[in-house]
Swiss-Prot record:
Function: Participates actively in the response to hyperosmotic and heat shock by preventing the aggregation of stress-denatured proteins and by disaggregating proteins, also in an autonomous, DnaK-independent fashion. Unfolded proteins bind initially to DnaJ; upon interaction with the DnaJ-bound protein, DnaK hydrolyzes its bound ATP, resulting in the formation of a stable complex. GrpE releases ADP from DnaK; ATP binding to DnaK triggers the release of the substrate protein, thus completing the reaction cycle.
Lineage: Bacteria, Pseudomonadati, Pseudomonadota, Betaproteobacteria, Burkholderiales
Binding site for Zn(2+) 2: 170, 173, 192, 195
GO MF entries: ATP binding; heat shock protein binding; unfolded protein binding; zinc ion binding
Subunit (UniProt): Homodimer.
UniProt gene name: dnaJ
Source organism of the structure: Paraburkholderia xenovorans (strain LB400)
Keyword Zinc: yes
Name used for this protein in its record: Chaperone protein DnaJ
GO CC term (a single one): cytoplasm
Record key words, sorted: Chaperone, Cytoplasm, DNA replication, Metal-binding, Repeat, Stress response, Zinc, Zinc-finger
Length: 380
């Protein structure tokens, strides 16, 4: 039987906000929760369906994969999310059921309701923020980063037990990780107070990790920064997050890239912009000027009579996009610079030049003539 659309299951629109999805889930979870419908297989089936839909849509990465590829993007048979089954819903939804049923419900979910053996948990993902230069972003490079993280204990190999021993099945919950308790007319499951939901306990803890199965360590990792990466993008390093629990897979490391402000260029996608001052003589007479680019120097011709603020486009002098062989453009915004701190001879030359312009009429300054024509009525 084909799976229903996750948005349809929760009764929300595809553009629903996180809060709308959460509210819809809480309402349906309350309605179909097994503790409210003992022995009702239909309610249990609806609850599993609602739980699975919320698990996918409450996680931004899983939701993006589902929006793009549908169920195939999150199919557990293809290594996607959702493979934990009914017993593991508390890991994703403990906050929800903590609100609905109180702290006891989170433990009941963690215990898994009749499963045999301890629950397996995937390790947490890690985030690492990294600042690079515009040049590094444009060309790409390989680097190393040092990331503080929990790693599996090398003495007990992550079991938490002293070498030569092993964790034992919890006698209080018989390995289920939960115990059933009654609160008023509710009969709910609660996290086992002895094993804290793992289903096992360690009679002889490892002396190195003190039973945790993991130790804090700083890892040195190789990171490849791809050419064309932009500010805010993330690089995924699979399996370099925190170790899993009870043999679960490790999480992933996400390296978030931030690009430092450049002293010359401003980036706009694959294009670059720069402000360039030019002498007023070059603007008036025209000429060839050189500009910097990320690949060296380039030159272009400024036509005579160039005005301040004029923009020139140099094709292909920007940045090649991520996984693209086509580079953006460089936009040079020229600013005509007025000379300062003139000597007397220089001032005299400019006065003579100004006199010659006046004698030549307004054709030398068309913008000034147009402006004065528009405002002359204010001076009448």
């Amino acid at each position: 039987m084909a799976k229903r659309d996750y948005y349809e299951v929760l009764g929300v629109a595809k553009n629903a906000s996180d809060d709308e999805i959460k509210k819809a889930y809480r309402k349906l979870a309350m309605k179909h929760h097994p503790d409210r419908n003992p022995g009702n297989k239909d309610a249990e089936g609806h609850f599993k369906e609602v739980k699975e839909a919320y698990e996918m849509l409450s996680d931004s990465q899983k939701r993006a994969a589902y929006d793009q590829y549908g169920h195939a993007g999150v199919d557990p048979n293809m290594g996607g999310a959702g493979a934990q089954g009914f017993g593991g819903f508390a890991d994703a939804f403990g906050d929800i059921f903590g609100d609905i049923f109180g702290q006891a419900a989170g433990g009941a979910a963690r215990g898994g309701g009749g499963r045999a053996g301890p629950q397996v948990y995937r390790g947490a993902d890690l985030r690492y923020s990294m600042e690079i230069t515009l040049e590094q972003a444009a060309h790409g490079y390989d680097t190393q980063i040092r990331v503080p993280s929990w790693v599996s204990c090398e003495v007990c190999h992550g079991s938490g037990a002293k070498p030569g021993t092993k964790p034992e099945t919890c006698p209080t919950c018989s390995g289920s990780g939960s115990v059933r308790m009654s609160q008023g007319f509710f009969s709910i499951q609660q996290t086992c107070p002895k094993c804290h939901g793992t289903g096992t306990y360690i009679p002889d803890p490892c002396g190195h990790c003190h039973g945790a199965g993991k130790v804090k360590e700083t890892k040195t990792l190789e990171v490849k920064i791809p050419a064309g990466i932009d500010d805010g993008m993330r690089i995924r390093s699979a399996g370099n997050g925190e170790p899993g629990i009870n043999g679960g897979p490790s999480g992933d490391l996400y390296v978030e890239i931030h690009i430092k402000q450049h002293s010359v260029f401003e980036r706009d996608g694959d294009d670059l912009h720069c402000q360039m001052p030019i002498p007023f003589t070059t603007a008036a007479l025209g000429g060839e000027i050189e500009v910097p680019t990320l690949a060296g120097r380039a030159s272009f011709t400024v036509p005579e009579g160039t005005q301040s603020g004029k923009t020139f486009r140099l094709r292909g002098k920007g940045i090649k996009g991520l996984r693209s062989s086509i580079a953006g453009d460089l936009y040079v915004h020229v600013q005509v610079e007025t000379p300062v701190k003139l000597t007397e001879p220089q001032r005299d030359l400019l006065k003579q030049f100004e006199k010659a312009l006046v004698e030549g009429g307004s054709r030398h300054s068309p913008q000034s003539k147009s402006w004065f024509d528009r405002v002359k009525s204010f001076f009448d």
